[in-house]
């Protein structure tokens, strides 16, 4: 099965701040119908890297069969880690980087490694048809104060995201 995974965060950079991120998994079922599933994560204090890593974990956690996945993300650290195969190197070295220092968020990286091990993946920062609607949705969600947790992460499941308009009404 071929799958596209889209990861978007509400901000860029290493600063810790209030943020939201969205993930979408898109695939074709046996009837030929495209299906999208996704969610939004909120955090009161996170970095882009940490949030993107959590989003990758959430997206891959719904996959129940081995697949070929193309992952679209603008998070430079996650993208470079995957494209340069650092994840496998860190895992072999006991979660120590090339400088001999412990990997930050080793537990989260390990969870991702376990989720990814049965899949073929390609990682890219190419533009995609969901980017703008995901960013718009994140901006709207962050504007609603009641949607943000006091601390830690909170998650909501989103209805299907329709291509390309991202109509978020449920399909029957």
What are these regions (language model features)?
Residues 6-8, 56, 72:
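Short hydrophobic segments within beta-strands
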Residues 11-16, 61-137:
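RNase H catalytic domain
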Residues 48-53, 105:
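Short, charged, low-complexity patches
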Residues 1-50, 62, 137, 141, ...:
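RNase H-like nuclease fold core
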Residues 53-61:
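An active-site-proximal "capping" alpha-helix that borders the catalytic cofactor pocket
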Residues 94, 146-147:
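Short, flexible coil/linker elements and helix-boundary hinge sites characteristic
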């Amino acid at each position: 099965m071929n799958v596209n995974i889209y990861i978007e965060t509400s901000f860029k950079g290493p600063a810790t701040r209030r943020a939201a991120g969205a993930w979408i998994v898109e695939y074709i079922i046996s009837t030929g119908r495209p299906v999208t599933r996704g969610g939004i994560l909120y955090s009161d204090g996170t970095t882009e890297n940490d949030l993107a890593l959590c989003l990758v974990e959430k997206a891959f956690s719904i996959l129940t069969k081995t697949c070929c996945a193309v992952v679209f993300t603008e998070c430079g650290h996650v993208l470079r880690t995957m494209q340069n195969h650092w994840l496998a190197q860190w895992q072999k070295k006991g979660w120590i980087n090339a400088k001999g220092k412990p990997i930050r968020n080793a537990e989260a990286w390990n969870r991702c490694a376990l989720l990814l091990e049965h899949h073929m993946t390609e990682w890219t920062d190419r533009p995609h048809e969901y980017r703008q609607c995901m960013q718009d949705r994140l901006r709207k969600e962050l504007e609603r104060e009641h949607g943000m947790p006091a601390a830690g992460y909170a998650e909501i499941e989103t209805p299907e995201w329709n291509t390309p308009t991202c109509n978020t009404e449920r399909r029957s």
